[in-house]
Structure formats: C-alpha cells, structure tokens
Amino acid sequence: MEGLKVDKWGYEVKTNSDSCISSINSYYHQVLSYGRERSVILEAPKQDPNCVLANILAAHYLSSADSSRAMPLLEAAKSYLEQASLYEKVVFDAINCLISPNRDDDVAVELHFKLLKDFPRDLVSLKRAQVLCFYMGCPDLSLKLVEQVLSVNKQESYIYGMLAFSLLELGRYTDAEEAANKGFEIDSEDAWTHHALCHVYQYKCRFKEAVQFMEKCSRTWSSLSSFMYTHNWWHVALCYLEGHSPMEKVRDVYDQNIWKELERSDASPAEVYLNAVGLLLRVYVRGGINVFGDRLKILADCLTNKAFWHLEWHLDVLVVWALSCTGEVSKAEELLEGLKSRISNVTKKKQQHMQRAMLLAEALFEYGKGENERALEFLDETFDAINYKIIGASDEQLDVFNEVWITMLLNSGQATKAIQAIEKLLKKREGTPFLWRLLEKSYSMSRKQEAIDAGKKAQALEAAYFN
C-alpha cells in the first residue's frame, strides 16, 4: 500500500507524514505515562488531515470534554476509512463504538478484545479498554485484557502497572505487588507503577513505607497530568491519615501537593477537585475538618460551578456531599436531579447498573445535611462499598463510603450493626487505627467490656506508624 509508515508498535499507518507519526507516538507516550501533554494528538490530523488513525485518536481525546470539536475529526476518519490500513480500521471500529452516544459497553469491550488479539503490542488500546472496564466496575475483564497481551509485552514496563492494578481491584495484593515490582525494575519512573505499589502498601497497613516510597518517587512527578499528580499525593495524604499522623501533616499535603496544582496554567481543575474532595470527606468522617479551616467551603464554592458536574459519577457523588455539607443544599438538589435525568437517558441495561450509584448519591446528600437515619434508608442493610465500583472508583476510593456507613449507623444508635460492619473490615485490614476507634465507640454504646481492649488496640496502632 502506497504511503505506509509504522507507529511505535510497528503497526502500519496510511500516511506520508513523518511528523504525523511522530505526534501519534508522542501521544502514546503521554497516555501511558499519564503525562500532561496528551493534546499533542491534535497536531497529528493537522500534519495529515487524511490519516484515519490521527483523526480517530484525536476524536477520542476530545470526545469527553469537547464533543463538538470531536465530530469533524470522526467524520474525517470515516471518509478516509477505505484507504486505511487494517490496523487503523480495527482501531477506528473500537473507538467509534466507544465514543458513540448511548454506547453498549459490552460491545465496546468486545471490540477491544478483538483489536488486541490481532494487534497485541498496542498498549494504548489496552489502556483505553482498561479504563472502560474500570468505569464498568469489571476488574475481571480488565485482567483478561492484559493477560491476553502479556506474553508479547514482557519487556514493556507499562504492562506491569496495568497488570498490577487489575490484580489490586480483584483483591490479589501479593500478585499485584510482584507485578508492580517487575514494572519498577524496568522503569523506576513509571507513576502508574508507583501508584500500584502504594495501593499494596496502604492495603497492608505499611503506611510509613508507603509514604517514604512515594515521597522518594515524587521527584519524577512534575510532568504528570493533574489527575495522576494529585492522585498520587492523595494516596500519600491518605497514608498519613490512616497511620494517625497529625492532621496538620495531612493538611500540608492537601495545600502543597493537591490544591496548589490549581496554580499551574495547564491544570485540569476537575481532576484536582476529585482528589481534594475525596480527601476532605475522609478527614470529615474522622472529625478532623476543623483543622482544615475553611478549605471545604472554598472547595464547595468551586464545585457550585456546573462545568464540573456530570463529568463522572464518582466526582458527582462526592460533590453532592460537599455541597449539602456546606449549606449549598439547593445546588446539591439540582445536581441530584441532574443525575436522575442522566440515568433516564441511558439504555435500560445501564439504568439498572447505575441505580445503585444514584442511591449512594442520595445517601451522601442526606449525610451531608446530618440526616443519618434518612441517609441509611437509601443503602442496603448489608451495605459494602466494594459493590459500588460502578461509580468509577478504586477499592481505596470506595473505602470512605464504608466509613460513612459505619458513622451513620453509630449516629443513629445502631451499634450492633456497626460492630458487624467494622469486624468485617478488620478481617481485611486489622492494622487500621480508625477502625479500632470506631469499634471502641460501638462497644461503648453497647456497654460491652470489649471497648477497653479495642481502645488499647487503637492507641497502640496510633503510635505504631509515625510517632
């Protein structure tokens, strides 16, 4: 075929432009490294307006934030599809399905499986498929995808971070640590591998080790996207918080490494707000929000801006809480109504999945207002946040909703139920001081002698990590 070049993976692309291929390859690197210059893909269609791969990748990049600009690129890709290489046609099919209105997630995943079967070195398509699986709450599919291409990518560092995260989400922490360490050996600057290892250390209550590791790695994070930069620091702050470091230390990380990101001219505010509000909810549940002064109110004022609504469910659920908690009740109600409308506009199959997310948002709205008993009415009797992956959140991000659930039970005088929920969590992570404090409170409310031992355990753990 005339005018063929090959991309980073060695796959054929119909173009005569070296600069177009260079922009595509730069985009690949930015995606896999969580760089902040993913917009480089917009250069590729300028360098060759007839290149299908350039147009469809640029359309995908713009699809979530600026769909009106994405449409002409999608149409350009369609119009030149007949002349494209087989690789480009398969990528086009997968992305076209992914960005279509009311897409069928299952079909989109299947198309990516097909793509990766024929073109297994395409790690950006693997990443794209894994992100889709994450928002579907299907880590099992994510693992199958990466395992399908692992054998031909064993020398690629990025593959191991992607493998590790899938394993983490399936609770296979030992396997995840092994995979992440392999990736770290190949490339010690891969931020997604840092992230995976921090997940492992955090889950295993190795809080000090996690903080030391991440702070050492942080010198390589300046070029990360707003999300990845602040998310890695969110993990650091969370380790300080869970390890019972002084609340002022958590506040310092919030100020210097999360909120400060907004000062950068190329920051993506919504990505920062997700990590900021997620951390402040954790602090709030622990009764430490006073140490943060007016930071929650400042954040909530930013979140009244509807430009940050309906970007993703996880953020919306947290925003509902932040608004209701700071007195912006009418705004929170407006966001809730928008979520209900959003659900009504998707396929019946997706409506069933997202109903659970809607109930969680309703519960967080009531919790923010201090209506604990009302909030509990929206959640199952045997609530477990692990069953809410559909909002697009990791196990660590979901954990806070278990803490909220237990807190609401205690605030409603339901100590026996709280004890059952806490004991279930302690079987997984018995080194968490806050859970022992909650257990102590639950036992005290039930007038049980076990409160003394729970308090001693909490005190010992509070002194174990950072004191």
Regions found by a protein language model. Give the residues of each.
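Inter-helical turn/loop elements of alpha-helical hairpins
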Residues: 18-21, 26-42, 46-50, 55-106, ...
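Residue-level recognition of tetratricopeptide repeat
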Residues: 19, 48-54, 86, 119-125, ...
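Structural register within alpha-helical repeat arrays
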Residues: 19, 26, 58, 93-98, ...
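Structural motif corresponding to the intra-repeat A-B loop/turn of tetratricopeptide repeats
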Residues: 31-34, 65, 100-102, 119, ...
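Canonical positions in the second alpha-helix
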Residues: 43-44, 77-80, 114-115, 148-149, ...
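Internal alpha-solenoid helical repeat scaffolds
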Residues: 75-193, 200
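Helix-coil-helix junctions within alpha-helical repeat/solenoid scaffolds
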Residues: 241-465
